[in-house]
From Swiss-Prot:
It comes from Haloarcula marismortui (strain ATCC 43049 / DSM 3752 / JCM 8966 / VKM B-1809) (Halobacterium marismortui). The gene is rnp2. It is an enzyme of class 3 (hydrolase). GO terms for molecular function: ribonuclease P activity; ribonuclease P RNA binding. It is found in: Cytoplasm. This is Ribonuclease P protein component 2. The lineage of its organism: Archaea, Methanobacteriati, Methanobacteriota, Stenosarchaea group, Halobacteria.
Amino acid sequence: MKHLPKHLRPRWRYLAVGIETWPNASFGRRAFQREVWYAAQNLLGDTGSAETDMTVLQFHDYDGTAEAIVRTRRGQTNPARAALTCLDSVDDDDVRVRVRGISGTVRACEEKYIRGPPEFTEQRHVVFENADRSATVRPPRYDVETASDGAFVGATALDFR
């Protein structure tokens, strides 16, 4: 089978995506890809979702954060960004998704927007709501575990002074 000439090949754009979640959440590329497809289909419909053709090329999961590169067709970056902002959970874990930037090549996307592993995280015991609680520290954030249900409360260093 012959290759298509360069001017007939589909052109792509690559979205660098930063994902933030609670420290105990864990999900992989497959779960994130599934949620991206559902978000695109719910927002854009079947034909709009097919036109954007969003695919997760790379996914790196760290403790409470993740980074991904999502491929979409050229000219469909705005609908793709809108679909990504509709994501609020992956595998029943709450997430915050932020598009860091858009590039024309995967390499440029990695070099400009993918930062690699975040700073170190550590476990501390802090006093929160007049009780000794366990907290995961990711400067400048503190994720304090609540005693009742094991959920987390987001805080900053200013909340402990």
